């Protein structure tokens, strides 16, 4: 008797109902994310960026043994709190006399994981800085961001959600 592999770590919400009408987008985005490390889903509010990002992440969980992780940023008004929000998602604690981004990058380095940053537009510069630093330090990291505008980080691919 063989046992099933344990589920990958992560914090993605369960899909509450079926996902209809974006199958082609999901296929194209999954293929795209195999080649790029930063993907931003852009479009106006309410168009379905978050739902598409979460579904894509759920579909890609088998590709990321260290999990797929969602950080919801809608209620993060201050970009200076962004590293703390991301660190808390992973259970990473701040170290005295060390920038939190350095602690975060060290903890994630060598891990193959997918990070979904949701609702970045109101702190887009802070998100861009964080993503740029994490991608530079964590070669196996992939990032999906949702925003009304691109992050404008090096290597970012922008997908306009119709």
Task: Locate the predicted segments by residue.
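Residue-level detector of conserved, well-ordered beta-strand and adjacent loop positions
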Residues: 13, 20, 42, 71-72, ...
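A generic short alpha-helical patch detector that favors 3-5-residue windows
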Residues: 4-7, 21, 40, 74-78, ...
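Residue-level signal for pocket-adjacent positions within structured domains
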Residues: 7, 14-15, 47, 148, ...
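A conserved switch/coupling segment of P-loop NTPase cores
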Residues: 30-35, 52, 57-65, 98-162
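Generic detector of short, locally flexible boundary/turn motifs and exposed helical patches
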Residues: 4-8, 79-83, 107-110, 124-128
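Post-nucleotide-binding-loop coupling segment downstream of the phosphate-binding loop, primarily
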Residues: 18, 24-47, 51-112
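Conserved adenine-nucleotide phosphate-binding loops and their immediately adjacent elements
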Residues: 1-31
């Amino acid at each position: 008797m063989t046992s099933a592999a344990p589920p990958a770590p992560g914090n993605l919400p369960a899909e509450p109902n079926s996902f209809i009408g974006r199958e082609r987008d999901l296929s194209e985005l999954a293929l795209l994310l195999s080649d790029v490390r930063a993907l931003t889903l852009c479009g106006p509010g309410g168009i379905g960026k978050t739902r598409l990002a979460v579904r894509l992440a759920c579909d890609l969980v088998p590709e990321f043994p260290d999990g797929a992780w969602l950080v919801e940023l809608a209620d993060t008004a201050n970009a200076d709190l962004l590293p703390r929000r991301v660190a808390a998602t992973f259970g990473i604690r701040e170290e005295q006399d060390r920038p939190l981004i350095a602690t975060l990058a060290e903890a994630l380095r060598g891990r193959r994981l997918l990070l979904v940053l949701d609702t970045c537009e109101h702190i887009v510069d802070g998100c861009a800085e964080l993503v740029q630093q994490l991608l530079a330090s964590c070669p196996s990291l992939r990032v999906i961001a949702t925003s009304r505008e691109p992050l404008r980080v090096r290597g970012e691919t922008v997908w306009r959600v119709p």
